Amino acid sequence: MSRSHRSSGWDLLSLFEERLEESAEMPLFSYLGRNMDVREQYSVQRLHSEAAALAAVLQAQGLKGSVAALVYPPGSGFVIAFLAVIMAGARPAPLCRARSRDWHSIALTLRQCGAAALLVPSAVADSLPAEILTLRALQVLRTDTLQGDAAQWRRPVLASTDTCFIQFTSGSTRSPRGVDISHDNILHNCALIARAFALEEKDVGVSWLPFHHDMGLIGHVLVPLYSGVHNYFLSARDFAARPASWLEAIARYRGSISGAPDFAYALCVERIAQEQAALLDLSCWRVAYCGSERVSASTMARFAQRFAVSGFMPDSLMPCYGMAEATLFISARRGLQIHERDDGRCDVSVGYLDVQRDDPCIRIVSPQEGAECAQREEGEIWVKSRSVARGYFQDDAIDASVFNAWLEHDSGYLRTGDLGYVLDDNLYVTGRLKNVIKRRGRSFHAEDIEGEAMTLLHGQGVARCVAFDLETQGGPALVLLLELDGQIEAERVHARLPELQTRLWYTPGILVSRMLLVPERALPVTTSGKLQRDRSRECFLAGEFSHV
């Protein structure tokens, strides 16, 4: 069902109400246990009723117009709380607590966004540290103990330009920032995704992506609400413990729409043997999207090859490009379109630029000259779209320079900070602007250096790596941190480091000043699994990494 004609001037609650009127008993969300059986199912009616009951309590607490942060484990509690906050006329801010040490950063975020309430289940509330409990003017609400009456809920008056929710960036290159997502932003982005994926109500979604992550929240909670697609959820913990559970859920429930970052596809290839793959029927999977991090041509090709025996079709692969500042989705391309550069490295197209459509409008701009680049010329990716947020929540200082950049006589562009180029109307992303390493008049991408290292050492004792530049008394120095995967002895990895040094010297042609092998899980990552390059640099300079 297409709703693109209604995405302008609407709000998310109006969409929810129309979905309720049209298909109240339709199953919308099903939650799976570890054995992949359905343990809980929500129709549109049940979802609305439980969210309205909680919203009535939140209204009684005086939260209208306030920010309410959410910290939940996987499950239905988050979805109900998220919708309830919006229905109460407040603004939800999903947060993540993966480890006990995350509470400090959560406390900083609560202060930053001025949260008036923290919504949590009792299991989380019981572990709250004093740093959270002593925050001034913060109500901690145990939502599983609140008894509300849906009949007491009063619908708030919402405008399409109002803040719908606050989506925090991943924090891979800087501290997480809260992006101010309006109702118009989210409905327009849902329309873009529905169009790109050609969604129909008969489609079935399957996801393990965390709800605090924009791909999980928007792609598998709000897009299903928009399009009527029934979605099955398994937990990220279950996927991490047994990657096959993701594909088993797709096969069992005939999932047609599912996806994840590149690392998840790589993990499936590593952990699922050919014999096990032969037992799966993935012929139903028509949209296998991949985004959130750089898409590897090698990973995509290996996944398609491994699961061909499962009936998986290579054309189902859909590399995507997006970011929180543009709500989520910017572009996508069905199938693998690969461009081999002169140096032999391969880039994957993450979008076909349809010249017949003016939203989103994507331009490649020279960071030095501020002019649009020619075909194949690398520059910063600029985006203009109704999906682009108005700015960062309560952080106006940089909004104009980031969210309203000028190109000749045209304004309103988002400067993504990503580098890329266009070739034959295909968009290719090559790295981050701030991750460019310059030597002898040449520019190198940290992502390319890491990719070259992983091509040699992945599966050979190295789980992941991060490269960054340092300024030293002797000049700039490239550092490469290599994280053990715990399956192979460190001595065997050390023996291959000279080969890696030589390989990087010849391709791409840069000298690594320092290589350090660090213990398993030592490298800092974001809540969505992205490596934190700046934090890695800080830890290295502070001597916090023990070497093996």
What does each model-identified segment do?
Residues 417-419, 454-485, 513-514:
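C-terminal boundary motif of the adenylate-forming
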Residues 87-151, 156, 261-262, 267:
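Structural core segment of the AMP-binding/adenylate-forming
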Residues 464, 468-469, 479-480, 501-548:
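Conserved C-terminal "lid"/linker of ANL adenylate-forming enzymes
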Residues 360-361, 368-376, 380-443:
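Conserved ATP-binding/catalytic segment of the ANL
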Residues 29-79, 83, 100-103, 107, ...:
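Conserved AMP-binding/adenylate-forming core of the ANL superfamily
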Residues 187-204, 214-256, 271-275:
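Conserved AMP-binding/adenylation subdomain of ANL enzymes
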Residues 255-259, 271-348, 361, 370:
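Gly/Ser/Thr-rich phosphate-binding loop
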Residues 24-27, 150-168, 174-175, 180, ...:
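Conserved pre-ATP/AMP-binding loop-to-beta segment of ANL
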